[in-house]
Amino acid sequence: LLDAVTHADTQVNQRALVVIAIVLHIHSNRLWLYPELETRLSLLNEDGSFGKQLNRIYIQLLRSQETEKIDKKMREEIIPEMMKNVSIMRNMKYGFEENIEENDRNPDWEKAFEESGLGDKIREMNELQLEGADVYMSTFAQLKSYPFFQNPHNWFYPFDMQHSSIIREFGLKPTGENAILSLILQSGFFCNSDKYSLCFTMAHIPQAQRNMMLSQMTSQDLNELMDQSKSSGLRQYAQRPDVISNQYIHDLYRFFKLSQRRHEFRDIF
């Protein structure tokens, strides 16, 4: 693990950091029994960067302790509020027939959006996500029954669109009809485990319905999402060390809370 911390691949060194933080926390009272290990840790932290990274990992691990509270808030407050306002949003006059230069944003939409309380809920969800909170646990908890998740190691497998299970089930390609979904899967919004769940779920949705779901996005949304600079920004965000370590912690959390074999292991959370 200590060798892996210095690996050039960010996926490797960040995962190693997470595991080191967990091991040091669980076995902190035994560290003094291994002076050579203490020496190695001191050498790694000569410039202070190792300690700063560990501190960041510990904060992320502490934040994961709030997942149940956030999950409850999502299920009981935020999601119901969003569902309650679906009909309002659908029946609202968006003003597409108006000259876009005269009115870029429909005031009726903004007023109803704020008065419904939906705006506050969405902002709250966005703030939680920006802080690194696990806001998707409740959404994906019911999507872990696929055969893929029967193997414990698959819960921690870095997401790969060329994984045999993806190709066999979905035939996902980075171009063509799946381009939008591919871009979403390359972003840092979801942890690896949830990306696999999303793929398997989409694979079982008829093509017509899948197209209808994607068609819900306006042409402007699609253009923005496919914009080269913005799509590049999404990919860069996904490669940030703090995003990778946080996603790995979310993967671990899902395994210890949702896996059918979770009772065979000590719950580190």
Language-model segments: residues:
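Extended alpha-helical scaffolding regions
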Residues: 71-143
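HEAT/HEAT-like alpha-solenoid repeats
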Residues: 2-6, 42
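Residue-level detector of extended alpha-helical repeat arrays and alpha-solenoid scaffolds
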Residues: 13-14
